[in-house]
Swiss-Prot record:
Enzyme Commission number(s) from the entry: 3.5.1.5
Name of the protein this chain belongs to: Urease subunit gamma
Gene symbol of the encoding locus: ureA
Lineage of the species this protein comes from: Bacteria, Bacillati, Bacillota, Bacilli, Bacillales
Record localization: Cytoplasm
Record organism: Staphylococcus epidermidis (strain ATCC 35984 / DSM 28319 / BCRC 17069 / CCUG 31568 / BM 3577 / RP62A)
Reaction(s) this enzyme catalyzes, per UniProt: urea + 2 H2O + H(+) = hydrogencarbonate + 2 NH4(+)
Length: 100
């Protein structure tokens, strides 16, 4: 089985997001890469489910809060951009200040 670079990148997001979900469920605070992966995965899945870019931009701000992440992580992530596949093509989702 051969994956394109884009497919490999998406698989890495899924794996990192699953690690982040398990750690969050155990009550651990997420670090920078874990927080990015979790939010990104939720956005990618939302696009797959048929949500609009506008809906996902709003939803992206509700996934994590400052209590879910290590000190300073929320301030490090001022913007998240990810390309997602929608029923009508690939679009860029941008979430400003995703961790409030």
């Amino acid at each position: 089985m051969h994956f394109t670079q884009r497919e490999q990148d998406k698989l890495m997001i899924v794996v990192a997001a699953e690690v982040a979900r398990r750690r969050k469920a155990r009550g651990l605070k997420l670090n920078h890469p874990e927080a990015l992966a979790l939010i990104s995965d939720e956005l990618l899945e939302g696009a797959r489910d048929g949500k609009t870019v506008a809906e996902l931009m709003s939803y992206g701000k509700t996934i994590l809060n400052e209590e879910d992440v290590m000190d300073g992580v929320a301030n490090m992530i001022t913007e998240l951009e990810i390309e997602a596949t929608f029923p009508d093509g690939t679009k860029l989702i941008t979430v400003h200040h995703p961790i409030v």
